[in-house]
A protein has these predicted regions:
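Short glycine/acidic-rich loop motifs that flank beta-strands on beta-rich extracellular proteins
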Residues: 40-43, 61-63, 69-75, 95-102, ...
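Glycine-rich phosphate-binding "P-loop"
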Residues: 4-12, 168-183
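Leucine-rich repeat
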Residues: 15, 19, 141-142, 277, ...
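Leucine-rich solenoid repeat scaffolds
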Residues: 310-358
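Right-handed parallel beta-helix
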Residues: 49-55, 82-93, 121-135, 150-164, ...
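Extracellular beta-strand-rich solenoid/capping regions of secreted or surface-exposed proteins
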Residues: 20-27, 38-53, 61-88, 92-123, ...
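Acidic Gly/Asp/Thr-rich repetitive segments characteristic of extracellular carbohydrate-active
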Residues: 3-32
Length: 358
């Protein structure tokens, strides 16, 4: 693999073309970006075998920042290949309002896709390390999205300020739209999220219709919702994973959540209502554990949003049999500076289990 040192300027079109010239003509390697803040006129796609790396910054904050001037809602970086690494880069995504089913749009980084025109190959072995995302005062679009046919993904030491959901992990499927899915469906798995920090966002992270996932050492502060474990609106209706059932082998540990929304810090739901025919299905969770977590209710971020007839709940569980809650702490002292709980260094992503082409 070849290393490439890129020169970027204040010309958004030239910057994007410099990246694309290498990404479309070479067969992989490392693209090293200089320190500074650089604008692209639209997002770029990373295919297989590429590392996108910012300038060295020691133990301090990142010194390379990318943004986009595009109003079209594509990710700043869209990963559509395997063996990809993105590290030591900050992202400033432009404002975007992708709508209820546009969770993979308007992001800093999206890995994979939500909807596919036909059966697809898996994207695997992707690492996101030492990345920062800022979209202050803007909560309509997600920051990092992991979608569909993706597996063996590592997200570590990521810091996010603002946005809708910090890290959104969502199933995908073959279909023209959410109400016309024909399957098969694809469910992210063998995913590790560690040392994630999200603040001033609507939500820290969610996992929708996944299996074999470890989340450890996360600090979510000033968020309306901490995190959600969801079955997906079609649960496993279009899934044919054999020994890899959806909703199996999920660990969330070492989470500190300071939430300022009117409802809950955490929601764990087993039921989903299909957008295709409105039928309700219930997913059976297997070997799912949430442990060693602390939840701190903060004053409401928006006055008047709470229902005086309905109390705020640290955890809401809805038809989610098979889930274990262990060593859960609720801190009513309202101290957002408190350190997180002890973490679980023994939690590991299970060994790869082939899911086959679904």
């Amino acid at each position: 693999m070849t290393d490439h040192d890129l020169t970027l300027t204040d010309d958004p079109t030239a910057n994007r073309q410099a990246l694309e010239q290498l990404l479309t003509t070479a067969t992989g390697g490392t693209l090293r970006l200089p320190a500074g803040t650089f604008t692209l006129d639209r997002g770029v796609v990373l295919g297989s075998g590429w590392t996108l790396r910012g300038a060295a910054h020691g133990d301090g904050p990142v010194t390379t920042w990318l943004t986009s001037s595009s109003p079209d809602g594509e990710p700043v970086v869209h990963v559509l290949g395997s063996r990809v690494t993105i590290q030591d880069i900050g992202f400033l995504p432009p404002p975007c309002a992708p709508g209820e089913h546009g969770g993979d749009r308007g992001t800093a980084i999206t890995i994979g896709n939500y909807l596919y025109p036909a059966e697809t190959e898996w994207i695997e072995d992707v690492q996101i390390r030492r990345v920062e995302v800022e979209r202050r005062d803007e909560r309509a679009a997600n920051c990092v999205a992991v979608m569909g046919a993706v597996r063996d993904i590592t997200i570590s030491d990521v810091s996010i300020v603002g946005g809708c959901t910090g890290v959104a992990v969502h199933w995908g499927a073959v279909g023209d739209g959410v109400d016309s899915i024909v399957g098969p469906s694809y469910h992210p798995h063998h995913l590790s999220i560690r040392d994630l920090r999200v603040s001033d966002a609507f939500e820290g992270f969610y996992l929708s219709s996944v299996h074999d996932v470890v989340v450890d050492r996360v600090h979510l502060s000033d968020v309306e919702i901490g995190f959600r474990l969801l079955p997906g609106d079609n649960t496993d209706r279009f899934h044919s994973g054999g020994d890899n059932p959806v909703g199996a082998r999920i660990r969330v540990s070492g989470a500190h959540v300071g939430w300022n929304g009117p409802l809950y810090a955490v929601r764990i739901a087993g039921w989903g209502r299909s957008e295709i025919d409105q039928t309700v299905r219930v997913l059976e969770y297997r070997d799912v554990v949430v442990r060693d977590c602390t939840f701190v209710p903060l004053p409401l971020a928006r006055a008047g949003t709470g229902d005086p007839q309905r109390s705020r709940s640290p955890i809401v569980v809805e038809q989610a049999s098979g889930v274990i809650l262990e060593a859960i702490r609720v801190d009513l002292r309202v101290d957002p500076t408190a350190t997180g709980p002890r973490h679980d260094d023994q939690a590991e992503v299970p060994a790869h289990q082939p899911a086959g082409q679904r």
